[in-house]
Amino acid sequence: MLMIRSLAPALAAGTTTVVKMPGQTAQTNAMVARIIAEAPSLPAGAVNIFSESGSEGARRLIDAAEVPVISFTGSSATGRAISAAGARHLKRFGLELGGKTPHLVFDDADLDAALPVLEKSLTVFAGQFCMTGSRLLVQRGVAERLRERLAQRLENLRVGPAADPRSDMGPLIDKANVERVERAVRQAIAAGARVVVRGGPVTEGELAAGAFYRPTLLEVDDPDLDIVQQETFGPVLTLQVFEHEEEGVALANRSEYGLAAGVWTRDVARAFRVARKIRAGTVWINDWAKVYDEFEEGGYRQSGLGRLNGVAALDDFVEYKHISLTTGAA
């Protein structure tokens, strides 16, 4: 769970914590609270959890002078808002925010290895993941083959309840988000995006009562369209074609986000050269979403401040003090 990445270093640093959980995950919240309450090594009051659908409780935490640190995972817009609200207290903020992860696929990439991963990078959590691979940047020599093969995979993908082992992708969190994602797709098409796979809300059958959204693939020429630049937080993928390495890197960096990226190539020298040029906190080479607890994770620019995981995760929750003693002066 994302919450544990903030809670664990806070407890390791010896702090007490108040955790605000979203109302949409009430069952998970209750389970976490029960596990923590039963942990014999945690003193009563070390971890305090509450759930809410609104923001009143969260606002009180941000406004409280006695709360020196806020660790937040969520959208960049909300991260900016809480930073501004807490600035008068000079609060310390650790912010894991939005992303618009690009996958750069070069002509020499192993498509058989890449395609299943590219599909999963869009459909895991139905795209409701800050590291969702939502931008596909493909070198022209392989673009047609990749487009056709990925489209076939997305069209054949089975949407259904997450508890059903036959499902390839589960639902969005609620119907309001289905409407939000569909609105973004419609606006993109109206602005010139070309439909490769037109998914959309499931409106018929037994799934119609749920918040199910079939994956969508749009090809775009304009890198400044909102669907390319703004986090969609749903199973919507844009495809852009580039000619050469420098153009691909420029497209990858043409975003206010900088959380993660993927590079697909058999050329090891190029893989590391491109990875160093991409402005993102995590870059995978021929893979996606390999995150290790022992290594620091976080974003550049609008994707956040600070780091989670690794030793650096403690930095948000500790203060450094310098004590100097002059001997013989007493």
Give, region by region, the residue ranges found by the protein language model.
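Alpha-helical segments flanking ligand/cofactor-binding loops in enzyme cores
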Residues: 8, 59, 80, 84, ...
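A generic structural signal for well-ordered alpha-helical segments
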Residues: 10, 86, 150, 188, ...
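ALDH superfamily catalytic-core signature
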Residues: 38, 45, 69, 77-222, ...
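Structural detector of well-ordered beta-strand residues that form the stable sheet scaffold
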Residues: 11, 18, 48, 94, ...
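Rossmann-like NAD(P) dinucleotide-binding subdomain of oxidoreductase/dehydrogenase enzymes
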Residues: 1-113, 242
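Short glycine-enriched loop/turn motifs at secondary-structure junctions
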Residues: 44, 64, 97-99, 130-131, ...
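CheY-like receiver
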Residues: 60-61, 117, 251, 274
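Conserved C-terminal structural/oligomerization subdomain of aldehyde/semialdehyde dehydrogenase
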Residues: 67, 104, 158, 208-330
